[in-house]
């Protein structure tokens, strides 16, 4: 099994690729297979942003692994004007929907209930098979409503850290 514990900087060459859906890229613990069929175990630091398309990982044995976003069934949303697009984004955000934002469009994982809501708001929707790379969110850490185990969700915010540079 190829065991991976850490992310690494972009590399010119790599020896394996992982083709993962957004849901799989969001997990810190995952058993999956490389594009070549090798068994892979991901054991990444908890509380980090999801893996993104083109990110690199380093395996315990020193091999470099490239992450590739697997195409998924999406809804491509457009509207007649910026106000309607903003309103659609507001209603999706109010439902905590993972959302990819582009110039004049939104994308979300295909969902017939959300599709109906968007069409009632006047948006146009079209099915699309493409990699999904939604916005991570302004504050970083995981969203939850739990009171038990709150210490596990004590991640530093990504916004309002004035003067702090990565």
Curated annotation (Swiss-Prot):
List the protein's name.
Answer: Urease accessory protein UreE
**Which species is this record about?**
Pseudomonas fluorescens (strain ATCC BAA-477 / NRRL B-23932 / Pf-5)
The entry assigns this protein to a family as follows: Belongs to the UreE family.
Locate the transmembrane regions by residue number: none
Q: Identify the stretch(es) annotated as Disordered.
A: 132-156
Q: Name one Pfam family in it.
A: UreE_C
Family matches, as CDD domains: UreE
Keyword annotations: Chaperone, Cytoplasm, Nickel, Nickel insertion
Q: What is this protein's function per UniProt?
A: Involved in urease metallocenter assembly. Binds nickel. Probably functions as a nickel donor during metallocenter assembly.
Recorded superkingdom: Bacteria
Q: Where in the cell is it found?
A: Cytoplasm
**What GO biological process terms does the UniProt entry carry, in alphabetical order?**
protein folding; protein-containing complex assembly; urea metabolic process
Gene Ontology cellular component list: cytoplasm
Q: Which molecular function terms from Gene Ontology are attached?
A: nickel cation binding; unfolded protein binding
């Amino acid at each position: 099994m190829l065991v991976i514990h850490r992310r690494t900087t972009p590399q010119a060459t790599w020896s394996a690729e992982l083709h993962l859906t957004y849901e799989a890229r969001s997990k810190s613990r995952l058993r999956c297979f490389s594009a070549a069929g090798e068994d892979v175990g991901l054991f990444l630091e908890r509380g980090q942003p999801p893996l993104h398309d083109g990110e690199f990982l380093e395996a315990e044995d020193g091999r470099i692994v490239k992450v590739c976003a697997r195409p998924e069934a999406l809804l491509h949303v457009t509207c007649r004007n910026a106000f309607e697009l903003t309103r659609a984004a507001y209603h999706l955000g109010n439902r905590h929907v993972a959302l990819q934002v582009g110039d004049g469009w939104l994308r979300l994982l295909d969902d017939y209930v959300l599709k109906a809501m968007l069409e009632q708001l006047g948006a146009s929707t079209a099915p699309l098979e493409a990699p999904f790379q939604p916005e991570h969110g302004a504050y970083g850490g995981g969203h939850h409503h739990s009171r038990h185990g709150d210490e596990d969700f004590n991640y530093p915010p990504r916004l309002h850290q004035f003067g702090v540079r990565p």
